[in-house]
C-alpha cells in the first residue's frame, strides 16, 4: 500500500459526511505496498482503512468489495466494506474511486512457524468454502493472459538470462491448463503482510484487490512460496514441515483431489512466475508516487528457479 494521491483532513472530513461512521479524528498515510493509496482513518465511531484505487479497472472493483462483504458475512475475518448513505460500497475522492473498510486488529508475522502456517491453511480453506456461494465472477486479473502481456512489455528490458528464463517458463506453463481442478474466488496475494495475528490466531486477512476466480490450489501455492521458505533471504527452497502444516490444515476442511496433488509443482512455478513478473514490471516500469514501496524482483526469480529445479518432490503429505 503506497501513497500516490494526497488527501487532506478537510477533504476527508467532507467525504465522510456521506457515511454513518462519525466524524474524523485522525488520518495517517500507509506507505507499505505498491498498488493503491491507503490511509488509516480513525473516527469518533471506529477505525477504518481508506483506499483510493490508482490503476485497477473500475469494472473490477465491485467484485473485490462484494467478495469482502460476502466473506465477512460468512465469518471470515476480513475487512468489511462500509456502504455510504446511498448504500454503495464504491465512491469517489479526489478524482479516484475510493472505498472505506473496517480496520482489523492484529499485526503481521515476519517469521511464521509451523503453528502460523497451520492457522493460515485452515483459514484459507474456510475462505474457499465460503467463496463457493459468491455469485460474481472475475477471472484472475494476474493470470496467464496478464503474464503474456507483461512479458511482451518487459522482454526488451531484460538481460539474456532473464529473457531465457521467462521464455522457458511461459512455454512450460502453456503446456498446462487445469479445467478440472476445483475453482472459485481466490485471494491470490496472501503474503505474510496480508495476514494479521493476535494472541497466536489469525485475526484478519487484508488486501483483496488482486482477488479473482482461479484454481483454488493457486492460492496455496502463493502462500507456500512466501510463508514456507527455509529462509527468505538466504535459502528460498520450501521448508517441508511448514508446507506440511499448511497443506494438512487446509485438507482437514477441504480435502485435495489426486489432480490437485499432481498439479502442485506447476502451481508453485505459476505463483513464482506471476510475482516475478509483477516485481519486474514495478521495477522497470514504475509509477510516480509520493510514498512508493517496490520489491526486488530477484527474490522471485530465485524462487522460480528453485521450484523449476525441484518440481518432482514438492508435494508434502
Residue spans of the language-model regions?
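A cross-family kinase active-site recognition segment
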Residues: 110-163, 181-183, 291-294
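All-alpha amphipathic helical-bundle segments outside canonical DNA-binding/catalytic cores
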Residues: 258-268
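An alpha-helical support segment within catalytic cores of ATP-dependent transferases
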Residues: 7-18, 135-136, 147-188, 198, ...
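Conserved NTP-binding catalytic cores of kinases and kinase-like/nucleotidyltransferase enzymes
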Residues: 1-85, 198-201, 314-317
